[in-house]
Amino acid sequence: MAVYVVTGKLGAGKTLVAVGKIQDKIVSGCRVATNLDLRIHKLPRVGIFAKSPDVIRIPDKPSLDDLLAIGRGNNSYDENKNGLLVLDECGTWFNSRSWADKERQSVINWFLHARKLGWDIIFLIQDLSIMDKQARVALAEHVVYCRRLDKITIPFIGSIYSVITGSKLPLPKVHVGIVKYGDSPQSMTVERWTYTGRDLYAAYDTKQAFSDAYEHSSFSYLTPYLSHGRYAVKRDATFYMRLTRIYLKKYSRVLCLFCGFVSAFTYLSLSKPEATPQIKPVTTQIITSRYKPSELRITTSYRMGNAVGFEFMDAKKQKIASDDLIKDGFRMVYITPCSVELIKDGKHEKVTC
């Protein structure tokens, strides 16, 4: 059996940590009994369609009859299946005066033998010193010290931020429970419980006031399915069609305005006149030859192996080499030493001596 005494100052997250453990037990299929006002359907990992949670609400300050009424938490020898009993505001139970109270002695005896009934227990108390020493020795197997990380200031960085902005450096609201094995702060740390808390705040009454004269006896909470799930709207195709119709009706004006802008933009884009392509005049450059074959005659010819060369003279008595004609685009076909055919642009002209 595991017995935890959860301690911490006001607002440190004692109840939140306990509700987190209650959620873990419910998800595992274990029984739960507590004097906290829970909203089981608000537990994020349980939901409104859960049919199996077995949670009992006992009076704020339970008597022996109330504890006997919850029965056994686990019928097997597997302690992982033990039920969980969570009791808040235990400072008035375990002080020195109450420890010696004969009326409360039977309740304390039940706590001492809760292991045989298959119950794990979480006691919530503001400070361990409030608890009677004999009770600490007998019951405080684990002590959990709760801390809120947003109350801590980061050295140096927090000071600079405070100087610049005039306010405390905002940190995430994370609740940490440091679990010690024993009732001494120097005892060995066995685990840490970490909860952000935002998803658990709605699952219990944070302003619950505990009274010695609780008017109700023990009772079982309805399962989330019976209290909420069976009344929930089925999210089928009809649901989403109805939801779509509601939103279309709600935002119809905005939708019409948006469609009008889109239609106008589309119309302007499609009706824009096409630009007339400009036809650029193509100027054809007629390249005239520098040499006229009809005015040429061969003055000199030579042949060395496969190499043939000619020298021409035009009407102006200017000498023209065969290389000049080749550069001008002519192709020469050798016929005889005194006859050659000049070809250019498909025209064939014969030049002689």
Curated annotation (Swiss-Prot):
Family membership noted in the UniProt record: Belongs to the inovirus G1P protein family.
Record InterPro entries = P-loop_NTPase, Zot_N
Q: List the transmembrane segments.
A: 254-270
Listed under GO cellular component are: host cell membrane; membrane
Give an example GO biological process: viral extrusion
Write out the function statement from the record: Isoform G1P plays an essential role in phage assembly. It is required to increase the number of adhesion zones between the inner and outer membranes of the host cell. The extrusion of neo-synthesized phages occurs at these adhesion sites. May be involved with G4P in creating zone through which the phage assembled and extruded. Isoform G11P is also involved in phage assembly, probably playing a structural role in the formation of the phage assembly site.
Write the protein's name.
Gene 1 protein
Membrane topology reported for the UniProt record: Single-pass membrane protein
Asked if the keyword Calcium belongs to this entry, the reply reads no
Localization: Host membrane
- Whom does it interact with, and what assembly results? Interacts with G4P; this interaction results in a complex that spans the inner an outer host membranes.
Please give the organism. Answer: Escherichia phage If1 (Bacteriophage If1)
UniProt: ATP binding residues: 8-15
Q: Which Gene3D superfamilies match?
A: P-loop containing nucleotide triphosphate hydrolases (3.40.50.300)
Instruction: Supply the Pfam families for this chain.
Output: Zot
Q: Which GO terms describe its molecular function?
A: ATP binding
Alphabetically list the UniProt keywords.
Answer: ATP-binding, Host membrane, Membrane, Nucleotide-binding, Transmembrane, Transmembrane helix, Viral extrusion, Viral release from host cell
Chief location category: host cell
